Amino acid sequence: MQTTIIKWHNIVKTIAILILLSTVFSACQKNFDNQQVPNTEESANGAAAAANAKGLEQTVSTNASKEAAAIGFTETSETDFEKGPKKNIVQIAIANPHFSSLVAAVVKTGLAGALADSSAKLTVFAPNNDAFAQLPAPFNNATNITAITSAANIAFLKSVLLYHVLGTKVKANQIADGRSSVTTIKPAGTSNDNTIYFSKTYNFIRVNGNSDVIFANIKASNGVIHVINKVLIFPTKTIAEIAVADSTNFSVLVTALSKTNLVSVFTSGGNFTVFAPTKAAFAQLPAPFNNAANINGITNTTQIAALANILKYHVVPSRYFAWDLGVFKRVTTLATAPNNKITTILGYNNGWVRGDANNMYSKITPADVLATNGVIQVINKVLLPL
């Protein structure tokens, strides 16, 4: 039986050692600010290493074992799956009380038959009850889900469930290391709204940037189940639509995109990562780049061209979740070469990014805002190229 509990402590130790070995000279960094990385690369390296080692050990080692135990699966339970004839996916879910919300959702949406189909070979990323509890009512527990009568809510819930299912059997070791993606059986509504994205490092698998596989490879007669700790919600808006809808944070960014005729980049199809500066981030720049009114009033073509290049410096033509950012990884943007690379630092809780002309790292928070054409990483400083 290849059922595998993610080896959290080994992952923690491996990542911590790899990071700390590259930063021995600054490992004694004492003044780490959780909201801001120091203004030199050396101290930033030490701070990042300390943050990652501490954050991974405290967060992963403390919570992962609890999550695996909470859903009733432990290493000793592996042999239990080998006893007697295998159950189908629905039967396995029904047999475990920690999947009661999932079972209620499957029944409410009429998907029990499809997920129990003996001729199918499916992969289900199965959220446990704790994952559903993070959703707003009426999707947050079995009782509320069972009571749903709204046709719109039922249709939405059905789409969400289908977004967790692959039409083929895929074991954890068949998911490629690094970044990859796969199409689910959810019918496509808009571009990429039925695709899920994997970030895999040292057998640790994260889906869509925020949902961890906490127990993998539960064999069923008609496929395999991977247990996850957050419900996957498919994207419905483009990067531009998300920015326009959040005027509190992104009104200056939207104005800048309009002034430079770059809105089409953020509405087009494809996969982009946008490091999106907030209104407060722009306010730190000198005039006329410091607010929407001043940007809208720019007429100097040289200034408009410079602003356009700065905005392109925030766009990576590939989808990077925070977990995909390496230690001082150089990432190529859409800005004019050769000064078109930014530096990123992995953070278990988000991460940091710096432009070559910045003397401070920008904190990514919030991270991994999923869009149909990419992902948004919200940052608190504008990135500046040389």
How would you describe each model-predicted region?
Residues 3-15:
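Bacterial N-terminal signal peptides that target proteins for export
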Residues 23-27:
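C-terminal motif of bacterial Sec signal peptides marking the signal peptidase cleavage site
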Residues 3-5, 29-386:
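Mature, structured domains of secreted/extracytosolic soluble proteins
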